[in-house]
Amino acid sequence: MKTIQGVVAAPQARVAIAISRFNHFINDSLLEGAIDALKRIGQVSDENITVVWVPGAYELPLTVRALASSGRYDAVVALGTVIRGGTAHFEFVAGECSSGLASVALNTDVPVAFGVLTTETIEQAIDRAGAKAGNKGAEAALTALEMINVLKAIKA
């Protein structure tokens, strides 16, 4: 029996991070966590990390598709925060962002790591951006690296 498991060390990996400016006070922490994980744990060099800022989470799928389709990146990490408000806006943005990012991964065969927080409150978002619940940006970055290695092993 053969077992394929990814590892997170990927020193030669080329990784793009697409990040939303909206709710930047939370997203900045997600970005710091992602970059730290890529460099410290994944051993990815600065020159192999590209950060692309977009207006909001709704714009992430299009940007991630452009990055994944460029052939310049082994994986893309999507970071953002969508906080529920008093209208249906949350469902539309969170749903379209999530399904759009999944579609990009399936249609490009490039790993897309989902680091978009979808929370009920600002406090929950802060907790998931490095406070009580870890840093989901770092987790997404490690997921991207692991998936690079899993897909390489499958194709080998």
From Swiss-Prot:
Domain of life, source organism: Bacteria
Record pathway: Cofactor biosynthesis; riboflavin biosynthesis; riboflavin from 2-hydroxy-3-oxobutyl phosphate and 5-amino-6-(D-ribitylamino)uracil: step 1/2
Chain sites annotated for binding 5-amino-6-(D-ribitylamino)uracil: 22, 57-59, 81-83, 114
Pfam hit, one: DMRL_synthase
GO biological-process terms attached to the record: riboflavin biosynthetic process
Catalytic activity: (2S)-2-hydroxy-3-oxobutyl phosphate + 5-amino-6-(D-ribitylamino)uracil = 6,7-dimethyl-8-(1-D-ribityl)lumazine + phosphate + 2 H2O + H(+)
Protein EC: 2.5.1.78
Entry function: Catalyzes the formation of 6,7-dimethyl-8-ribityllumazine by condensation of 5-amino-6-(D-ribitylamino)uracil with 3,4-dihydroxy-2-butanone 4-phosphate. This is the penultimate step in the biosynthesis of riboflavin.
NCBIfam families noted in UniProt: lumazine-synth (TIGR00114), PRK00061.1-4 (NF000812)
Similarity comment text for this entry: Belongs to the DMRL synthase family.
Protein name: 6,7-dimethyl-8-ribityllumazine synthase
Lineage: Bacteria, Pseudomonadati, Pseudomonadota, Gammaproteobacteria, Enterobacterales
Gene: ribH
